[in-house]
Amino acid sequence: MKYLLLIPDGMADWEVEELDGRTPLEVAETENMDFLAKEGACGIAKTVPDGFEPGSDVANLTILGVDVRKHYTGRGPIEALARGVKGKLVFRCNLVKVEDGVMVDYSGGRISDEEARKVIEELNRAKPYDFVKFYAGKSYRNLLVINKDFRDDVKTFPPHDITGKEIDKHLPSGGELAELLKELMGWSAEILPEITDKANMIWPWGGGRMPSFPNFGQRYGLRGAMITEVDLLEGIARGMGMEVVQVEGITGYIDTNYRGLVRETARALEEHDFVVLHTEGIDEVGHEGDAELKVRAIELYDSKIVGKLLNKVDLDETRILLLPDHPTPVKVKTHVAEPVPFTLYGRGRDEVKVYTEKSCRRGKFGLVDGLRLMDLLIKK
């Protein structure tokens, strides 16, 4: 038996007035996800434990069976695992645009990987402290490493949570480390405009010390592989001892290389027992707050990812679990911690006929703790 986990990041949503009171998932034409729901069994999953922010890090770790209450240290350190970066403290470091004290773009104008690398090189040339170092990632998603002993109880805010809001109310807080971060942010605001017109400030957040995750193969007795468009999931996979499969031409947006993602997923499924395909585009559109574009993004995912994979895998010998990690409602343009709809193909059927937030609530699994999902997928 093969196991395929499909995670369309941020797909779940709320009812939207401009969509006649329906969710983007309800409006979108999704015959392939509907097939999985009709031929499988459904439920809703709590992927964000109480007391945690609804980040993709927490939610995806939970889906993969990792108890974040024991193993989570921050988003930055997980992304560092993806790049082989080590340090005492690691922060995710966005390139952002701020105007008149307001966060207007958390993604640095979707800066290209190449331009972002040049920006990071210049930041390292001009950095004010030797114990500070920047590492380039993908597009606006970069890292800040601080190799000095600080208490790591600083409070930071994800920039995608404060789009359109004043940054003064959301700056780092919590002692000496917070003061350093604010100093670096102010310093970057002075030099970034000389380097690029896409971003005018760095925004460090999600920092912590390097984590230790349970080994996937040892725990489940399966050879696992991860295909993803973002460093975060690559870091989770590497931290769990899973193979990471690279795909050329991916963008983390709705213009991504769908064909390459499908090809490499199908190939990985031939060589491994368990494969995760995590895509980012739907979540990005949710952060933009565009309901119609989110409908389109979901339809692209259904036709170009799910539909193509259904034609490539042996459905008699493959179990498929499909769910977003968290909702990203277009109304609020950020993540929320509500349960997400899931469908599990290959473990019996229920009465659900379509894959939506509402229909999955009527599924036979009901409300499930996200930590149970892996057992539901792979148990005999």
UniProtKB/Swiss-Prot annotation:
This entry's Gene Ontology molecular function terms read: metal ion binding; phosphoglycerate mutase activity
EC number(s) on file: 5.4.2.12
GO terms for biological process, alphabetical: glycolytic process
Q: Which domain of life is it from?
A: Archaea
Which pathway does the database say it acts in?
Carbohydrate degradation; glycolysis; pyruvate from D-glyceraldehyde 3-phosphate: step 3/5
* Pfam families documented for this protein: Metalloenzyme (PF01676), PhosphMutase (PF10143)
| Stored CDD domains | iPGM_like
* Keywords (A to Z) from UniProt: Glycolysis, Isomerase
Q: What does this protein do?
A: Catalyzes the interconversion of 2-phosphoglycerate and 3-phosphoglycerate.
What HAMAP family does the record point to? ApgM_A (MF_01402_A)
Q: What is this protein called?
A: 2,3-bisphosphoglycerate-independent phosphoglycerate mutase 2
